[in-house]
């Protein structure tokens, strides 16, 4: 496990209560490890962090996308708070190096498990919120999610719907998605998906079928336009 100093530097925030940070990075497998001196894991913080993230992302969108209607804002929010986006944020923070887990969980591929990274990211958001206030948490989320706010059109936020609309507008059958390959351990698999519209095909990979489908749809749309 790494020292927390680098993580706090990336966050731009230093915890006053380090036990909150430790709790946010403690995997549930530790419940079975009686020698671990902290009796809490990140699940409760994850629950709170999910709500805090949704609230603050909604507020950021409401203020920054003044000309967007509710339906479009909902699509963008769905993209910003989905598992894949949260995992990217957690990966850039290198959370896999900081999550505290049992040896058994680590051997089973726990450090590269997207679910663990997503859960720890949400728990970390809750820990920041409890250790500081809503304004500081807002600023940190705005910074961590900044690159995802730069997308210029809804195609990038909801590529599957956009591809379906393109197919209908051009009198083609609806897109067909097919799982081509699954590699890796059970809880850290990499999925390869193919999407086909008429004679056009695109293959992409992701940590979930849903992520791979979105990537494939987005890539195919960029080729078609």
Curated annotation (Swiss-Prot):
- Write the Enzyme Commission number(s) for this entry: 3.1.26.3
The record lists the catalysed reaction(s) as: Endonucleolytic cleavage to 5'-phosphomonoester
Which positions in this protein are listed as binding Mg(2+)? Answer: 46, 119, 122
Tell me which residues make up the RNase III domain: 4-133
Q: InterPro entries given for it?
A: dsRBD_dom (IPR014720), RNase_III (IPR011907), RNase_III_dom (IPR000999), RNase_III_sf (IPR036389)
What is one term from the GO cellular component aspect held by the record?
cytoplasm
Q: Which family does it belong to?
A: Belongs to the ribonuclease III family.
Q: What is this protein called?
A: Ribonuclease 3
Organism of origin is: Rickettsia prowazekii (strain Madrid E)
């Amino acid at each position: 496990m790494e020292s927390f100093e680098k993580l706090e530097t990336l966050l731009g925030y230093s915890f006053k209560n380090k036990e909150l940070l430790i709790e946010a990075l403690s995997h549930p497998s530790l419940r079975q490890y009686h020698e671990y001196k902290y009796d809490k894991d990140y699940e409760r913080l994850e629950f709170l962090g999910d709500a805090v993230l949704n609230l603050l992302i909604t507020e950021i969108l409401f203020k920054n996308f003044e000309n967007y209607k509710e339906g479009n804002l909902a699509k963008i929010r769905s993209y910003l708070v989905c598992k894949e986006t949260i995992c990217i944020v957690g990966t850039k923070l290198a959370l896999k190096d900081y999550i505290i887990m049992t040896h058994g969980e680590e051997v089973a591929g726990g450090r590269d498990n997207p679910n663990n990274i997503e859960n720890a990211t949400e728990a970390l958001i809750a820990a920041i919120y409890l250790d500081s206030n809503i304004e500081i948490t807002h600023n940190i989320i705005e910074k961590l999610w900044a690159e995802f706010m730069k997308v210029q059109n809804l195609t990038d936020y909801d590529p599957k719907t956009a591809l379906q609309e393109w197919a209908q507008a051009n009198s083609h059958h609806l897109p067909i998605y097919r799982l081509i390959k699954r590699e890796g351990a059970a809880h850290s698999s990499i999925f390869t998906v193919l999407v086909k519209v008429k004679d056009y095909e695109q293959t992409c990979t992701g940590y979930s079928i849903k992520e791979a489908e979105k990537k494939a749809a987005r890539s195919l749309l960029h080729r078609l336009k």
